[in-house]
């Protein structure tokens, strides 16, 4: 079958199932907006003593699909922690549906070899795991989706999650959770819970893993208690310092800075950079560096942006606080300044991945953008 740009897409992949090529339409006609709510007895308690108990109560079985978010990026402790427990419990043939996998997740290689993980669906992969996969580690191909299309696939049921294991920096005993806390301890704050929000809404079972339990109600919350089944308290869920790594680093590389400066000049000359415009700068040293040059042009021309979208950095926050950007829509906080801003700034709003960029809805935030700057390892010139 051919997709909207004429590229042949297999109709079916053995072990994965039937595929539907993108036909150019932003609206597929079916979105399951209702969260999955399991039946609950009045006497049941959400907090359990450990991960083993949570797994047992979740109903997880061999062959099911488990999901995770990557808001801690290379500082994430949850995926390795949960997979180690599942390996000790003897599970096999699971589908790993993480929103992304980083260098810290190299232990997944061993879990693939042992048979714990049969297949992977994700939006990104780095480090030793990516190299091993590229060299033929798995029998079945990895299914990569964009962050927005992962949100669409979950909402529409193309990606059915049996149990979501979601690390949250704060939660109350009922499961109102967020990426920061207003009750003091922010040692594991990660900011926006944009990727986790979709999993929480649609997974059959949601297990929150936190290192900071607070009193009810934990407001504001990114994940409401109505979407949470079980809660486990652990010593640490992640290291926020790992958020700034790899693609989200601040560059001093002269070549990347030159690329950024040239990109900003193109934007200025495009005619789109006018008062009230909107923009997104993605991950990658050069892409993130564009922001500083846009700021200079905006000050020169007395231009203010209506909103900035996407992975949010301290540079975007500074421009917001300076009055150059009116509002921020945040699906992922790229540094600790962005984390702090989400907690303190009224017009810094966290959004979920489907709201951000789903191809299955007409009103996705990306459709409102005037300017987007993204990075790539390779770009063709003769597609």
Identify the function of each model-found stretch:
Residues 1-382:
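Conserved alpha/beta enzyme-core scaffold
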